[in-house]
């Protein structure tokens, strides 16, 4: 049995700082997802302005407790309008939340302290208040499309103050 690889000290050597999105392996690409679940919330688009509005209604496959997909490998079959993120489309999708690791790296920015690749802990996304845990009102299977306007919220498009800090706060 081999020892687990050591995390680099500081942030030198982290792949997202040295590789383009196109150069990343499949595993590296997938690890850019912080597991917040914000992209799995239903969104509405204003037909006149093109503005995007988040709701606190989750996709039918969103596990609101873990903030992950209940059937990730088959999500496109079960949810045909599920958008698969690619290096090309993360640069153009205007509805990705400001905290999105894919979006940050595509823009040449660094990941936040709470991103699991930086913290080494998948729970820091919840600790920082970035995830949808405890904030999903219901599933799209429970809330009719006609009622979605009643569920518009602003928080998914905002970054909590705690999450904007340069490093993990000491409690």
From Swiss-Prot:
Family classification: Belongs to the UPF0260 family.
- The record lists the organism as Bradyrhizobium diazoefficiens (strain JCM 10833 / BCRC 13528 / IAM 13628 / NBRC 14792 / USDA 110)
Name the record gives this protein: UPF0260 protein blr3103
What is the superkingdom listed in this entry's lineage? Answer: Bacteria
What are the disulfide bonds? none
């Amino acid at each position: 049995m081999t020892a687990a690889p050591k995390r680099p000290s500081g942030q030198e050597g982290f792949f997202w700082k040295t590789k383009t999105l196109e150069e990343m392996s499949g595993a590296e690409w997938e690890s850019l997802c912080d597991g917040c679940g914000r992209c799995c919330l239903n969104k509405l688009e204003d037909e006149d302005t093109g503005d995007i509005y988040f709701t606190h209604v989750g996709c039918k496959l969103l596990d609101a407790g873990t903030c992950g997909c209940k059937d990730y490998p088959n999500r496109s079959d079960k949810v045909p309008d599920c958008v698969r993120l690619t290096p090309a489309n993360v640069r153009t999708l205007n509805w990705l939340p400001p905290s999105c690791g894919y979006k940050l790296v595509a823009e040449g920015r660094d990941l936040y302290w709470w991103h699991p690749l930086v913290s080494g802990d998948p729970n820091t996304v919840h600790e920082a208040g970035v995830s949808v845990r405890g904030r999903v009102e219901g599933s799209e299977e429970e809330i009719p499309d006609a009622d979605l306007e009643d569920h518009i919220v602003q928080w998914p498009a905002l970054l909590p103050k705690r999450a904007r800090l340069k490093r993990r706060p000491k409690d």
